Amino acid sequence: LRVAGIQNNYGIYKLEMPTGSGKTHASLRYAINNVCSHNKKRIFYITAFLSVLEQNAAVIKKTLSDSDYILEHHSNIISERDTNSDEESSTLDYRQKQYLIDSWNSPVVLTTMVQFFQTMFKDKSSNIRRFHQFIDGIIIIDEVQSLPVNVLYHFNLMMNFMSTIM
């Protein structure tokens, strides 16, 4: 994977491994090597299941060791504004985090398939602001087999577009 990450600048690749064999580490290693070798800007880790996302977020944070560079965007993230009593610092932190969530302006973005699809296909302004972040990015899609059959055509069109144009 290290060599593939260095040699391949773009494309769509499939990694099949049994559960528990290290797909998260392997795909992350490929992505990091590709980012370093080809001046990519971001790594997106996308999965359909919150439980998988939360589990792999912990693995990715432990592997990368600096969670300041990692943005988690899903429905189980609770804002510190909701739990912090210091209103002034809470408002500033909330605004900064909300900006990152609205823009996905972070080196590593961990999110759900729902957020990914909304960014690609919805016309809401926050989704449009995120879309350009895919340019020069590495997209890792975990559990892709969980996609409903009725979205596969559009999903494949978008993936082909993104792999050749972006």
Predicted regions and their residues:
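N-terminal helicase ATP-binding lobe
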Residues: L1-M166
